[in-house]
């Protein structure tokens, strides 16, 4: 599976897992939300190990840009808050950084 697909799935798993904790602690949802939340966070960690990279830190750094874009998508689609110009500019810069890390000759 290509790295970008793994990063997309990892971001979805991480944001879903973190939102489960947010829902429990900030929105007053049942503690049962933590069960799928923890499973989702475990899936996130496992997915990042599937990226073909020699160093974990480089994998995490490249993933960071994808996570930012996925988080802003979640903000808009799940929470109904439209990202502003500054959100989108920051996401573009982060994605450019991720692309440099991923595509750099090694």
UniProtKB/Swiss-Prot annotation:
GO CC annotations on file: plasma membrane
Subcellular location(s) per record: Cell inner membrane
InterPro entries in the record: UPF0060
The entry's keywords: Cell inner membrane, Cell membrane, Membrane, Transmembrane, Transmembrane helix
Transmembrane spans: 5-25, 31-51, 61-81, 85-105
Membrane topology (UniProt): Multi-pass membrane protein
Domain of life: Bacteria
Family in the record: Belongs to the UPF0060 family.
HAMAP family on file: UPF0060
Protein name per its UniProtKB record: UPF0060 membrane protein R01043
Organism of derivation: Rhizobium meliloti (strain 1021) (Ensifer meliloti)
